[in-house]
Amino acid sequence: MASSSNKDDSLKNLFSGSSSKRRNFEVTPDVTPVARIKVLGVGGGGGNALNRMIKSNIKGIEFIAVNTDAQALYHNEAPVKINIGKATTRGLGAGSHPDVGRQAAEESSEEIKQALDGAEMVFITCGLGGGTGTGAAPVIAELARDMGILTVGVITKPFTFEGHRRRTQAEEGLENLKNKVDTLITIPNDKILSLIDKKTPLTEAFMVVDDVLRQGVQGISDLITVHGMINVDFADVKAIMENAGSALMGIGYGTGETRATDAARAAVESPLLELDIQGAKGILFNITGGSDLSMFEVDEAARIITE
């Protein structure tokens, strides 16, 4: 067996050749660039969700806050901020009127397109029922799709206690949005009540809403941007989500010996799912665990999800 020094000499000779016939080799790695992903938080609810994502240090995403309320934008942590409809609202908000939100987005369409430029995938997140998110989100989504960008809406519907008007406006906004995006993930806030304790303060309940929106975005974006045991690239995600229509989201956690299967069952039976997932045309799932997570556990979890 050759010594390590002889091995090194052999490698040098293999790649460099003799001193009299030395050649220079340039190795270009075959690396596919990661898709450029942008998240637009629209209105108050979208802006709050954006702040939650930023604090969670989600990697590989560009954050853009969009609002008619200049003061809310000032306090937002997104590096890019667009105050839409300055002539329409003078930076004072949409007053819970979706028509004003729509007009504001149309007024600022060129600025929005500049912010969208270069993206392969865009998430539009907002809370439906108010003025800016409900009115502006469909306009932004249409601009994005017209630019050839894979467009995903991740939105919430208001709590019942928020009143009839907001619920009605949310349903109208949902109808306007669903045909403007490739995939629409809808999360009814009332379903989130089942995830929290009855004594949870109102402010904390809305923080849970923000975090569910964060998980909806991160669960998909991590598939593309984070290196895992089994890698999924942007083309795989696009094949599932392009022109997919309505989508459902489930979240599950598990600990102990049966952690993977427990998490999978919890996700499949998640209260966030309004419908049974049987008959789904496609599915994306992201399994995250410690360094001791085994391939056997992943296989068991995948079987539960796909069967």
What is the meaning of each model-derived region?
Residues A2-E307:
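Tubulin/FtsZ superfamily GTPase core signature
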